[in-house]
Amino acid sequence: MLHSVFEWAVKDRLIPRNPTEDCIAPKVQKIEMQILPPEHIKDYLEAADRRGLLPMFYLELVSGLRKGELTALLWSDLDIQNRTISVSKQYVKNPNGELALTRPKTETSVRKVSIPQKAVDLLVAEHNKHPDNPYMFPSPVTGEMYYPDSIVNLHKKILKDAGLPHIRFHDLRHPYVKHTTKNKSLQKQKSQAIKEF
């Protein structure tokens, strides 16, 4: 974009030459995704359960929600009868560091996500702990919603408790993102491991 602006300035004879022509753009370093192997799912979920976080992280593993989508869930987003979660909002940090409720990243991100009956049962049990709170996963400290970064920190603690190597929270959703789902066998193994928990 900057190059185009300077090209316009050269064309209009505002400057003699485009100073960006000699610039070399740095290469964007891709971060390799790590997948939680199916054989580690049980350990991961047991560690989440010991911290009282099983419903949240079980839902994450079966739905692949983004952290901001997970924290923005309300009880009204759960359709118990049809076993779906409505994803229509997310919490993100604005430049001031404050949380803002926004639409999801893209229009296709506004969706209904099917979840297994076990996830529904865990969510109903979680709701019974705080029936008057509108948030699906309120913070036990404040009763308000979690900050999205707090979810990431909890994920790191769960990995440590389970003795598992570091995997980014974002990578938990890897098998659920259509354009990255290449290994159907691995996806089936992961689904089976979650069902067996």
Where are these regions (language model features)?
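Long, amphipathic, Lys/Arg-enriched alpha-helical "connector/arm" segment
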Residues: 22, 26-53, 62-65, 73, ...
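Short, polar N-cap/turn motifs at the start of nucleic acid-interacting alpha helices
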Residues: 77-84, 184-197
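Hydrophobic recognition helices of helix-based DNA-binding modules
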Residues: 2-9, 123-127, 180, 184
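Short, basic (Lys/Arg/His-rich) helix/loop patches that form interaction surfaces
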Residues: 42-53, 63, 113, 127-145, ...
